[in-house]
Amino acid sequence: MFIHQTVRRNRSEFKINPHEEFRYFLIFAPLKQTFAMNYKEVIDNIYNEVKPFFGKGHVADYIPALANIDPKQYGIAIATLDGQIVGTGDYQTKFSIQSISKVFTLAMVVRHMGGDLWKYVGREPSGTPFNSLVQLEHEQGIPRNPFINAGALVVTDKLMNLYHRPKEAILQFVRSVAGNDDIYYDKTVAQSEFEHASRNQALGHFMKSFGNIDNDVDSLIDVYCNQCSIAMTCEDLAKSFLFLANHGINPHNNESILTVSRSKRLSALMLTCGFYDESGEFAFRVGMPGKSGVGGGVVAIIPGKLSIAVWSPELNEHGNSYMGIETLERFTTNIGISIF
């Protein structure tokens, strides 16, 4: 109430001592900077700074459909809660979102299961690669978190229990949060992934042996490969994560997707687990909850303000977009805002 009342007054109306003057500066100087931010100029400058980094990473080569992508593509898009959409570079080019889809399926399952989901998957960083089998045996088939492949398979398995037509439900959800009915599954990518899904098949069967997978493993892998193949642009992705920046409310239609509490917890998981064994480094360098995919996409949010999506197919040694990480580090540095 204090801030709302103060905003309506002229600063000259206040008779305040030097301590109050300093307090005024602390409260309103950052707000003024935020409201006046020219995001288009910011990302254009970052784009030009980062573009020379082409060639420092490599495309995902274990999925043929991804290995054949032109690596020299790079786009950035920002969507704000006050309705701004800005982009630069290849921000309107579609690409498969891969593991970014795990955020959508997690939101769908948490929406219906709530805390019951955590009986089947943990909430701790793994510190291991995204497709690792190592911890599962020690932890009795319970994956560390929902963003490594094993955890995402558990989430998709529960989603299959909730929806009679899970693939249709996932696509409908993504279209709704992105405000775009033209989003689709890339069947070529999905088929390519299914044909090279030996590790995910192993994860599924191993967890099923512990009783932590309910559905047929082949059917589970089919749904999972399709969700990873969803084709979106940077603009689509930025818009689709606004419901998390908006504390669980889809700003495109005012639908309540998650409670405020669940939205915060999902964002917390993105911060601690969203970048596999680089999650701590990302939090240290960037300071935003986010999620990456081996298709080269990265998306992150500043709660209450905006979401930003970056795409460049060349990956670093952790399987995250090399230029995407560089872009987001520069973004929070340049605007002077993160969650910390």
Kindly give the residue locations of the regions a language model identified.
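Short, Lys/Arg-enriched N-terminal segments with co-localized hydrophobic residues
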Residues: 15-18, 22-36
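Active-site-proximal alpha-helical segments within enzyme catalytic domains
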Residues: 103, 107, 231-249, 302-313
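A short, well-structured edge-of-sheet supersecondary motif
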Residues: 51-88, 299-300
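Active-site-adjacent helix/loop patches that line small-molecule binding or acyl-intermediate pockets
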Residues: 38-50, 54-55, 111-227
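Penicillin-binding protein/beta-lactamase superfamily catalytic region
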Residues: 164, 194, 201, 205-265, ...
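Short active-site loop at a secondary-structure junction
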Residues: 72-74, 87-108, 120-123, 143
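Active-site SXXK
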Residues: 82-83, 96-118, 240, 308
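Structured C-terminal helix/loop/strand segments within mature extracytoplasmic catalytic/sensor domains
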Residues: 247-340
